[in-house]
Amino acid sequence: MSSTAPKGSTPTGPASGPSLTPYFFILFGMSAGLGSIIVLLAELRDQLGFSETGIGLAVGSGFGAAFVACLVMAPHADRGRAPAMLRAGLALAVAGMVLLAVGQELWHYVAGRIVFGFALGTAGPAARRTVIVADPANLGRNIGRLGAWDVGGFVAGPVIAAGLTAVGGFRFTFWAMALALSLLLPVAFRAQPDVAAQDQERLGLRGLLRIRRLIGAFFIVAAYFVFIGAFEAVWILEMDTRGASRAVLGVALTVGALPIALLSPLGGILAQRYGARRWAVGSLGIITLMVIFWGIVPGVVGLIALTVATSVVEGFGFPSTPMLVAAAVPEDRQATAQGLMVAVEVATGAVAAIAIAIVYDAHGDAVAWRTTAVTMAILLSIGAILTRPEDRKPVRPGVPTRTIRRPFR
């Protein structure tokens, strides 16, 4: 079930898979759409009179739909349907935006977020599967590029939404985003299926949770998304408490996310060169130490500077976790494993956001960030143990067929 190559070798030869450009563009557009939705939540509350609970219901519904889609739809990408899933996800995203544009009642917005969340959970694993198996020699670079387009869209979305809302209001923004996404449909029809092995036995999720190193990779993923959940729950509130204006918050969020988008391709190359496990554990270990100081540094400027510094480390380490997941399964299970990984991300982020918000409300930011760091350290340690190969050699995934060393039996 595994193949090997000489120690230290690197897969060579020209890429034989499909063009990745449609996958990059569409993920960028959908991430920009998600970013625009998030930044307009306060506008919906103020203009339509929704309660905080109602807004929370809409947000939670979107995450729940993405969680379900990742588990239900991802296996289909392993059966040669990735291009169709990309088109379906994009069409659903357009429909979700239209629902948000015409909605009047809370349930309209809950429905819109459910549709858009399901769209993300449908297109995401399809894109990851194709990027992973299309060009083994440049796996790290391509996963890094996918992450860069993904994060770049999420950064661009709020900026675009702010400008459009200033011109024509929040409904105009949703209509404009729906139009922009619909313009990507011709690009979606250019997406071609990969030529890698497919899940002919229709195994789906069966057996994946018996793979020790895949479970370990999920623990490492969970460690990172404890940090993400804590960030979403605490960072903006703490910046507001320290006196940051709306404008400063917007600039800080953009500047804080840019290093991830800019450095992810290089981070992927380095992770493939030095080993995905080593790179993931090392980068997350550094982030864990840095998080402790988030509750110590004084003032708005100090917190922004530390956020940017942490983001630089995130950028270098961002591609290594999906690479570690990719290294734990054969090529015909890639989309399913990546979908399960996204489900772990969503679930961990949601639980962490709730738990750390409670800690922050009761004890302040210093205790909240220390709690985050301790939780990350525990999960990361478990993941490092479970992903450790018996021969102690670096995990350098060259997925799918020219693997340097595959960490499962």
Task: Please give the residue ranges for each predicted region.
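Conserved MFS/SLC helix-loop-helix module at the cytosolic interface between two early adjacent transmembrane helices
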Residues: 67-101, 271
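Cytoplasmic helix-loop-helix junction between adjacent transmembrane helices
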Residues: 112-150
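Interfacial helix-cap and linker-helix signal at transmembrane-aqueous boundaries
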Residues: 45, 76-77, 163-168, 239-240, ...
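Central cavity-lining transmembrane alpha-helices of secondary-active solute carriers
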Residues: 60-73, 254-266
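C-terminal membrane-cytosol helix-exit motif in multi-pass small-molecule transporters
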Residues: 178-197, 382-387
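Juxtamembrane intracellular "pre-TM" segments in multi-pass secondary transporters
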Residues: 2-17, 191-218, 400-408
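A late C-terminal transmembrane helix in Major Facilitator Superfamily
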Residues: 334-362
